Amino acid sequence: MTTAVTQAIIDGFFDASNGDPFATLGMHETEQGIEIRTLLPDANRMVVIERESGKEITELDCVDERGFFVGVIPNCRQFFAYQLQVFWGNEAQIIEDPYRFHPMIDDLEQWLLSEGSMLRPYEVLGAHFMECDGVSGVNFRLWAPNARRVSIVGDFNYWDGRRHPMRFHSKSGVWELFLPKASLGQLYKFELIDCHGNLRLKADPFAFSSQLRPDTASQVSALPNVVEMTEARKKANQGNQPISIYEVHLGSWRRNLENNFWLDYDQIADELIPYVKEMGFTHIEFLPLSEFPFDGSWGYQPLGLYSPTSRFGSPEAFSRLVKRAHEAGINVILDWVPGHFPSDTHGLVAFDGTALYEHEDPREGYHQDWNTLIYNYGRNEVKNFLSSNALYWLERFGVDGIRVDAVASMIYRDYSRVEGEWIPNQYGGRENLEAIEFLKHTNWKIHSEMAGAISIAEESTSFAGVTHPSENGGLGFNFKWNMGWMNDTLAYMKLDPIYRQYHHNKMTFGMVYQYSENFVLPLSHDEVVHGKYSLLGKMPGDTWQKFANLRAYYGYMWGYPGKKLLFMGNEFAQGREWNHEESLDWFLLDENIDGGWHKGVLKLVKDLNQIYQKNRPLFELDNSPEGFDWLVVDDAANSVFAFERRSSNGERIIVVSNFTPVPRHDYRIGVNIVGEYEEILNTDSMYYQGSNVGNFGCVASENIESHGRENSISVSIPPLATVYLRLKAK
């Protein structure tokens, strides 16, 4: 038998402090019969109706004029499905009582959630439109184990926290309520009384859709359908395939010309996909698209990890964008940020009054570089929340890979901290063992559940084994950004050519560690912001030399082992730094403006991508010493480099770069194979606005010793240029 309803209990509902509503509301067995209790602020009358027959059963007594009703059905001993006819003055409506429905989360689900071993917690937590006992509605669930009370508030109840307090499951710390007649598209939040008695209004961490900033509510949205991985997409991700990535910030790639506002996902698909296809890129990498409050973070401070940002449209529209990329044969990579989150009050910070998602000690839980909070990777539920989010984007939107941001800040406890600002691990070391285990677990989950999907690490240190299998002690990533190569080569390219001879090793040192990891060569957004200048702006010399330097550098990069990544705008040598609030300077491609300098770089990048995809020596053996051989590595005086790229079937391409403005005629290079070498690329071609110094299409080897080899070729190396020479098939 149930306990009687006291005035204190009723008062607890109206001051929104009652944390156990199902102990009081709904149907309860008493000595007199079944008693029905309902809470509906401001209602005048309440009548119980049998749902199946529509028959009026009884009118409930109003025991508190604020809107609390109680009534007994004499001699009734069996619970039944009912509805409530509610009178508001002279108006009446029939509603379903959310407190007549049984719990929908089972013991196994609760155990898996608390253990952090549920593969797809987003199928259980959050807001799910569904049908229960023939009634459509939304089932809301929230993990907040230390809250005293949680209510669901939204469009459906005037954002009144008194109306729909939720059921607490102590085994898992999950609050639950099925809300009949709630529907897709409605806005909602969770209203909590935290462990300290403070009122908090929180967005849903598992929301599939969110409001556009500055509004912060979650939106009921359907769980996206599973997108199956295809064999073609799997193949395009493999390490022995050409991977050329176009990195894109959706808010500034191209904007509406009339009002400088964003294009939506569908408009972006109309313009971006054909452009990327035409340019020959194999992959698009989007800067983070999980919902985020501050435009200036570029998405790198997300709060709605399961919500595609509403800046550009709905989750369904984002799905269409990915689908159209796939239809064009382009794979999609998404930047993913599990390293930290902002402290906006509607977000994860102090979620239930405790440091639920973050660490309580700021030496572990506060990131001073970005004024953000660091996830507690040692907590099962948090680890599962994050790792499953990666799977969600891959499985539910068809994203082909993730690029994990700021890995170094995750795996080192002393990252950007001085002594006294960090806590050693249990062994006294600086490694964040929990974060390392989290990354291994996430990569295991990705590769076991979405075979063919890839993960890429932005890891800026020499941490060993980033791309090694986790079973061999590695982190389990497929690729790692080669930050060392990028920093060294850009430092070299910034130098006046007369000084480059003294820094020759900056262009060659990368081969010392080339085979330690599977690398991507990144010329990313980070290199064209915050006073670093554009890539073109980094190049020394007058206009001709700046463009020639950049073209030569691109040629060197596309010939060098490693997958390629280029941030938008760099494909046509935008002259100013990237600005996230403006479109790229597409007008620079008008040849009437500057004589075609920028158009020349655009043509070069397009040709580089096409040559890259069509020639196996340039991509097949990136991670094998069999695929590379230095031919000229020590000619610092002339700033000349030459190396051979090879494929498994014996195809060979020689890459020759001259990083001085002096043409090198009759320059002899030792070769491994006798034959004719055809010039398939020359960054100094007049087609790219170069000076057109070259080799008239082909050079033949001669039996003249050079660079320790019996045979050699004599070539003309253009000024500030890179040339590709392909061995002709016999």
UniProtKB/Swiss-Prot annotation:
<dbReference type="GO" id="GO:0003844">
    <property type="term" value="F:1,4-alpha-glucan branching enzyme activity"/>
</dbReference>
<comment type="pathway">
    <text>Glycan biosynthesis; glycogen biosynthesis.</text>
</comment>
<dbReference type="InterPro" id="IPR006407">
    <property type="entry name" value="GlgB"/>
</dbReference>
<dbReference type="InterPro" id="IPR014756">
    <property type="entry name" value="Ig_E-set"/>
</dbReference>
<dbReference type="GO" id="GO:0004553">
    <property type="term" value="F:hydrolase activity, hydrolyzing O-glycosyl compounds"/>
</dbReference>
<dbReference type="InterPro" id="IPR006047">
    <property type="entry name" value="Glyco_hydro_13_cat_dom"/>
</dbReference>
<keyword id="KW-0808">Transferase</keyword>
<dbReference type="InterPro" id="IPR037439">
    <property type="entry name" value="Branching_enzy"/>
</dbReference>
<dbReference type="InterPro" id="IPR004193">
    <property type="entry name" value="Glyco_hydro_13_N"/>
</dbReference>
<dbReference type="InterPro" id="IPR044143">
    <property type="entry name" value="GlgB_N_E_set_prok"/>
</dbReference>
<dbReference type="InterPro" id="IPR054169">
    <property type="entry name" value="GlgB_N"/>
</dbReference>
<dbReference type="InterPro" id="IPR013783">
    <property type="entry name" value="Ig-like_fold"/>
</dbReference>
<keyword id="KW-0119">Carbohydrate metabolism</keyword>
<dbReference type="InterPro" id="IPR017853">
    <property type="entry name" value="Glycoside_hydrolase_SF"/>
</dbReference>
<dbReference type="InterPro" id="IPR013780">
    <property type="entry name" value="Glyco_hydro_b"/>
</dbReference>
<comment type="function">
    <text>Catalyzes the formation of the alpha-1,6-glucosidic linkages in glycogen by scission of a 1,4-alpha-linked oligosaccharide from growing alpha-1,4-glucan chains and the subsequent attachment of the oligosaccharide to the alpha-1,6 position.</text>
</comment>
<dbReference type="Pfam" id="PF22019">
    <property type="entry name" value="GlgB_N"/>
</dbReference>
<dbReference type="GO" id="GO:0005829">
    <property type="term" value="C:cytosol"/>
</dbReference>
<feature type="active site" description="Proton donor">
    <location>
        <position position="458"/>
    </location>
</feature>
<protein>
    <recommendedName>
        <fullName>1,4-alpha-glucan branching enzyme GlgB</fullName>
        <ecNumber>2.4.1.18</ecNumber>
    </recommendedName>
</protein>
<feature type="active site" description="Nucleophile">
    <location>
        <position position="405"/>
    </location>
</feature>
<keyword id="KW-0321">Glycogen metabolism</keyword>
<dbReference type="Pfam" id="PF02806">
    <property type="entry name" value="Alpha-amylase_C"/>
</dbReference>
<dbReference type="GO" id="GO:0005978">
    <property type="term" value="P:glycogen biosynthetic process"/>
</dbReference>
<comment type="similarity">
    <text>Belongs to the glycosyl hydrolase 13 family. GlgB subfamily.</text>
</comment>
<keyword id="KW-0320">Glycogen biosynthesis</keyword>
<dbReference type="GO" id="GO:0043169">
    <property type="term" value="F:cation binding"/>
</dbReference>
<dbReference type="Pfam" id="PF02922">
    <property type="entry name" value="CBM_48"/>
</dbReference>
<keyword id="KW-0328">Glycosyltransferase</keyword>
<dbReference type="InterPro" id="IPR006048">
    <property type="entry name" value="A-amylase/branching_C"/>
</dbReference>
<dbReference type="Pfam" id="PF00128">
    <property type="entry name" value="Alpha-amylase"/>
</dbReference>
<comment type="subunit">
    <text>Monomer.</text>
</comment>
